[in-house]
């Protein structure tokens, strides 16, 4: 069953300006080490960071909290499955909120799609509760 849906659309130029103005202070505050390593390898760094930023916003909306109630930027990280498909890994306050949303006997599956078409980046998150037996 679907227990959360969130989406976000961001102007990549905002992220470009934040990187130019604040550099590592911005990237280290908002992104996990895995996200930074992946984005810093890209020719289009700002697009990569913008997609991940949008994913975090979308995930926080799917959790129903936004970036509040103990949910922080680095509590949500974009990772790729072995197939290359992106998903989210939650820790800290985000993981606590997610656990509180799950019905007894269920585990979470977080579905994520991210895309960009300059100057915009978009993310869509669906949080699904699946029976632990599956």
UniProtKB/Swiss-Prot annotation:
Its main location: cytoplasm. It is found in: Cytoplasm. It comes from the Bacteria. It catalyses: apo-[ACP] + CoA = holo-[ACP] + adenosine 3',5'-bisphosphate + H(+). Its EC number is 2.7.8.7. GO terms for biological process: fatty acid biosynthetic process. GO terms for cellular component: cytoplasm. It holds the Pfam family ACPS. Its cofactor is Mg(2+). Keywords: Cytoplasm, Fatty acid biosynthesis, Fatty acid metabolism, Lipid biosynthesis, Lipid metabolism, Magnesium, Metal-binding, Transferase. Mg(2+) binds at residues 8, 57. One of its GO terms (molecular function) is holo-[acyl-carrier-protein] synthase activity. Transfers the 4'-phosphopantetheine moiety from coenzyme A to a Ser of acyl-carrier-protein. Belongs to the P-Pant transferase superfamily. AcpS family. This is Holo-[acyl-carrier-protein] synthase.
């Amino acid at each position: 069953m679907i227990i959360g849906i969130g989406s976000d659309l961001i102007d990549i130029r905002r992220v470009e300006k934040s990187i130019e103005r604040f550099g590592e202070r911005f990237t280290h505050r908002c992104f996990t080490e895995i996200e930074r390593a992946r984005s810093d390898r890209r020719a289009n760094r700002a697009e990569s960071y913008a997609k991940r930023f949008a994913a975090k916003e979308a995930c926080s909306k799917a959790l129903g909290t936004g970036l509040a109630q103990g949910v922080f930027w680095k509590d949500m990280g974009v990772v790729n499955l072995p197939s290359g498909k992106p998903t989210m890994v939650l820790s800290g306050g985000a993981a606590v909120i997610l656990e509180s949303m799950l019905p007894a006997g269920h585990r979470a599956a977080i579905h994520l799609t991210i895309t960009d078409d300059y100057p915009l980046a978009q993310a869509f998150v669906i949080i699904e509760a699946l029976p632990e037996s599956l």
